[in-house]
């Protein structure tokens, strides 16, 4: 145990060599002494090392290929979108590392990203996985909850509060984070014609988002909600925050068709109709987003657009089984904790995928379909020691019948509801 020694004479600090009468305090250990000045110096060194470790993720920026390899572990398909994101994110954080004393007059501007694709195509998962890959704070916001300042709804600054909370109120970390704003298409201007009725959840929100997208020092209420005159605010610089905006943009294919029908020489509008949906989305231009209802200034803040494809049965089956955190692996592990094996037949995986397409929910709807088929089993099996294996078949999914249940000898148990 450490103690203060004031009785002994000619004691010196073992680190700096100062006598005890030259310092305020001298702390004794087992044959060694340390003064208050050296303690303060050690404390500063430790704090600097901790700060350096905190920012280590940013000093060891993965290459675009490494980013994409990590995305491939969790996100199936969407190769073009993943490549676009990997390059854009790499350039964004490389730009942050370059900030400081300028060797030339070239200023690298921030490039926010828009993800356009149908519900359940993986927009949110891509953004989440990117943040995890880079070890930066991440927040999700829904554009439909935002309104212009002064109206009922959330101020845009509340988006920043979520990021600050994700960074445990470490502002430096938050200022290098990623914010994903979903359903950005829902704040499109209601029409291209001006109206005497104020569009507080459309163009008004776009105008409010402009500054934080570009980069500004924003005042954020620490408790959320509306700002109050006497409330102390958190100041955060949004210049280096990466914004990823996602939306389905339902009907934008028609906007692209009209443009192609009018501008492609030698092709009639009927021939433009022959473009399939994916081919049309691949040809999206800023003027299409403007015609859809985004204002030009807003489009200018989001120069990178990545298109996500509609997922087919094969892609959905792969999503069910291949990623590190695939749903089949999750539910298999869940029942394994009750000493029960879970198996999905190939036909069952196809049936689950087809039902998700039928419901137009994409990958987002896969979990609910599996949950529906397993809810009774997960309720009953922990109380039934006879069941050692559960097999999900296509009939289980399509006809909502009970899965096949087997005992330890491999005998099929009666398909009626299991009992305790």
Curated annotation (Swiss-Prot):
Keywords: ATP-binding, Chaperone, Metal-binding, Nucleotide-binding, Zinc. The gene is clpX. ATP binds at residues 118-125. This is ATP-dependent Clp protease ATP-binding subunit ClpX. ATP-dependent specificity component of the Clp protease. It directs the protease to specific substrates. Can perform chaperone functions in the absence of ClpP. One of its GO terms (molecular function) is unfolded protein binding. Residues 1-54 form the ClpX-type ZB domain. NCBIfam families: clpX (TIGR00382), PRK05342.1 (NF003745). Component of the ClpX-ClpP complex. Forms a hexameric ring that, in the presence of ATP, binds to fourteen ClpP subunits assembled into a disk-like structure with a central cavity, resembling the structure of eukaryotic proteasomes. InterPro entries: AAA+_ATPase (IPR003593), ATP-dep_Clp_protease_ClpX (IPR050052), ATPase_AAA_core (IPR003959), Clp_ATPase_C (IPR019489), Clp_protease_ATP-bd_su_ClpX (IPR004487), ClpX_bact (IPR046425), P-loop_NTPase (IPR027417), Znf_CppX_C4 (IPR010603). The keyword Lipid metabolism does not apply.
